[in-house]
């Protein structure tokens, strides 16, 4: 009896523990079910809120883009409606009128207009302005055609004026030439007391002379070649436009049958006397029936 009593007690304890576990599991199951049904609802609400926020952001971005496009289109239409040449002429006329009014007021008060106007400029600025005006007047007086050499010189100077120097490329090529000469031993790099580096040409061969041919080794970059091609195309377009305008002015829309003005006059004289005899022959040649 004493041996069976502990076994029965253990079985009873195990049954009691099992009943408590079952009770606890039954109590916990509703909570688990409630949690599982609540989390998907919160996730759906959060996703809907995020989608609505993104939609509102897209709406605001679309409205901003529309407003910017409208402003750009309005500015473009205003810019196209205004003629730049007319605005320049208007500013010029305004400046001339202001100059005349100021001159009249000064002369009416008994003062010297040129002297008063010179107060606003320094001597160096006045000299530069006089030199510029003189150069401009000389260019205007020298506008007439003289000979082809002079015309080519004017075109060359105008092209040089429209071609700014590339100082960055110049400095790069200069440093490359100095490094090459220093590596070859023909150029010495000397450091002064201030720490400045000076290149000394002891052999006298670094700088170009009249006998130098190093310029023939220069290879232009792609941008320079493209600029040359564009300039040539512009020149051809301008020449074709002038030729077309000249032909339209003279009423010559047909084929060109002359090589210069003298030959043109001779052809016109022949046409006055012989067109009535050669009209049928020329038409036959054009149709190809003469052959």
From Swiss-Prot:
Residue spans of biased composition, Low complexity class: 30-40
Organism: Pyricularia oryzae (strain 70-15 / ATCC MYA-4617 / FGSC 8958)
UniProt record similarity statement: Belongs to the SYF2 family.
Pfam families reported for this sequence: SYF2
GO cellular component terms given for this protein: catalytic step 2 spliceosome; post-mRNA release spliceosomal complex; Prp19 complex
Lineage of source species: Eukaryota, Fungi, Dikarya, Ascomycota, Pezizomycotina
Name of this protein: Pre-mRNA-splicing factor SYF2
Origin superkingdom: Eukaryota
Region (Disordered): 1-89
InterPro entries assigned to the protein according to its UniProt record, in alphabetical order: mRNA_splic_SYF2
Locations listed in the record: Nucleus
Bias (Polar residues): 1-27, 62-71
Role, per record: Involved in pre-mRNA splicing.
GO biological process, one term: mRNA processing
Keywords: mRNA processing, mRNA splicing, Nucleus, Spliceosome
């Amino acid at each position: 009896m004493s041996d069976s009593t502990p076994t029965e007690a253990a079985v009873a304890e195990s049954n009691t523990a099992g009943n408590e576990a079952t009770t606890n599991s039954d109590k916990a199951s509703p909570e688990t079910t409630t949690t599982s049904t609540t989390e998907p609802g919160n996730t759906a609400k959060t996703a809907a809120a995020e989608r609505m926020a993104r939609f509102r952001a897209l709406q605001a971005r679309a409205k901003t883009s529309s407003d910017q496009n409208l402003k750009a289109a309005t500015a473009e239409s205003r810019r196209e409606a205004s003629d730049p040449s007319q605005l320049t002429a208007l500013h010029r006329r305004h400046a001339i009128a202001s100059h005349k009014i100021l001159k009249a007021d000064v002369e009416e008060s008994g003062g010297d207009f040129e002297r008063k106007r010179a107060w606003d400029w320094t001597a160096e600025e006045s000299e530069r302005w006089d030199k510029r005006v003189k150069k401009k007047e000389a260019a205007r007086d020298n506008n007439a055609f003289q000979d082809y050499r002079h015309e080519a010189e004017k075109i060359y100077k105008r092209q040089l004026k429209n071609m700014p120097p590339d100082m960055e490329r110049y400095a790069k090529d200069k440093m490359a030439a100095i490094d090459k000469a220093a590596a070859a031993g023909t150029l010495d790099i000397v450091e002064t007391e201030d720490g400045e580096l000076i290149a000394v040409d002891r052999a006298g061969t670094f700088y170009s002379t009249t006998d130098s041919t190093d310029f023939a080794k220069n290879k232009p970059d792609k941008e320079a070649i493209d600029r040359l091609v564009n300039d040539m195309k512009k020149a051809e377009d301008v020449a074709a436009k002038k030729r077309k305008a000249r032909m339209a002015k003279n009423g010559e829309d047909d084929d060109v049958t002359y090589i210069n003005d003298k030959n043109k006059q001779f052809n016109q004289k022949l046409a006055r006397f012989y067109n009535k005899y050669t009209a049928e022959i020329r038409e036959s040649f054009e149709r190809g029936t003469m052959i």
